[in-house]
Each structure stands twice: as C-alpha cells, then as structure tokens.
C-alpha cells in the first residue's frame, strides 16, 4: 500500500486536459473555462505546453485594461514561464513546487508532452495532511532549505514568503529590480522590457 505522500501525480491528475492554441481569442478561452468549470487552460503547440491562461491572467491583462476579449489572443495573455511536473513525480513534490512558486496547478508531462494537470485541490482530496506540509514548506525561508531545482536554472532564484509589491499577492516572492514580486508580475515586467 502506498503512503499518500508517495502517490505519483499521474494517479490524481485530471485528464484529458482542456487545452487551446496560442491563436485562440481570450473570449473563446473564457467560454471554454466557463463550459468546463475550470480556472485555467493550458496552451499547447504540438501537444507540448507552451503557456497557461488562468482566470487571474484574464482579469489582470484583459479586463483591468478594458480590452475586448475577442480582440486579444491567448499568446498575448498567457503565462509563458510554465512550470510542469513529470507524471511519475510524487504529489509531495507537486505540492512543494506549488508552494514555492505560488501556483495552484501544474501541467503533467511525459517526454515533454502534456498528459494531464494536477491542482492543489486534487492533492488535498487524496492527502489532506499535505495541506499542512505545504503551508509549513511555504513559510520556510530559503536560508532554512535548499531552493527547489526544476531542471532549469531559470527557477533557481531564492524566494521568500511575502507580499508582491506590485499586485499584492501573498506567498512566494523574490527580489527583482529592487522590489519583491511574484513570478507573474516579474514576467509582465520582463515582457515590457522586450
């Protein structure tokens, strides 16, 4: 019998994943979310995840700027620094990644291709005790633990538990150009610099 924390994400993930292409309008994406009662759509190219559009992305990047959803494409709104998890990783690993990066869902991949999606709710439903572990893990400072490696140097920066000085998000933030910001706000600033 498997201990709940050792369960692979492939056993709790949702599949098939509701996905879209980067050329779809935000209007169509929002309708897909509504029809399927979901909070995010994974954007794929050749079945490989290249981004994710969340409800928060739509509110921050379309609604709050008074843009017309039919005129805005997914590629303009999606979070491009998508964090994925291998299907054989444990739900504990998934929970730690979510806590570290302040995200609620992780696309699950096999050989780089999208095979499912795992959410905080999926994990807590199977292993409620992980909720406490995740909260505790999120509050540990980088000095007290190793920074999680995600097979890329891109995410090796040190995070702290705090408040984003741009949007007010509470969770994992990191120093960026003299301010503590969440990953989504950092991505927005980097896009503006390009």
From Swiss-Prot:
Keyword list, A-Z: CBS domain, Iron, Metal-binding, Repeat, Zinc
Record-linked InterPro entries: ACP_MB (IPR044065), CBS_dom (IPR000644), CBS_dom_sf (IPR046342), Diverse_CBS-Domain (IPR051257)
Domain CBS: 13-72, 78-133
List of residues binding Zn(2+): 164, 167, 182, 185
Domain annotation ACP-type MB: ranges: 159-192
Top-level taxonomic group: Archaea
Stated name of the protein: Uncharacterized protein MJ0653
Species of origin: Methanocaldococcus jannaschii (strain ATCC 43067 / DSM 2661 / JAL-1 / JCM 10045 / NBRC 100440)
């Amino acid at each position: 019998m498997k201990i709940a924390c050792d369960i692979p994400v492939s056993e709790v993930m949702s599949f098939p994943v509701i996905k879209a292409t980067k050329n779809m309008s935000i209007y169509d994406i929002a309708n897909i979310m509504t029809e399927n009662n979901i909070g995010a759509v994974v954007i794929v190219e050749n079945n490989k995840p290249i981004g994710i559009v969340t409800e928060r992305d739509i509110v921050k990047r379309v609604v709050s700027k008074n843009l017309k959803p039919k005129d805005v494409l997914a590629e303009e709104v999606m979070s491009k620094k998508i964090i994925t998890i291998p299907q054989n990783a444990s739900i504990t690993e998934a929970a730690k990644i979510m806590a570290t990066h302040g995200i609620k869902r992780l696309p699950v991949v096999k050989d780089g291709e999208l095979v499912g999606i795992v959410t905080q709710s999926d994990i807590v439903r199977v292993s409620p005790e992980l909720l406490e572990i995740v909260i505790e893990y999120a509050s540990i400072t980088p000095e007290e633990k190793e920074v999680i490696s995600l097979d890329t140097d891109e995410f090796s920066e040190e995070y702290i538990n705090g408040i984003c000085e741009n949007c007010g998000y509470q969770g994992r933030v990191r120093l960026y150009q003299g301010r503590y910001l969440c990953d989504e706000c950092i991505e927005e600033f980097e896009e503006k610099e390009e």
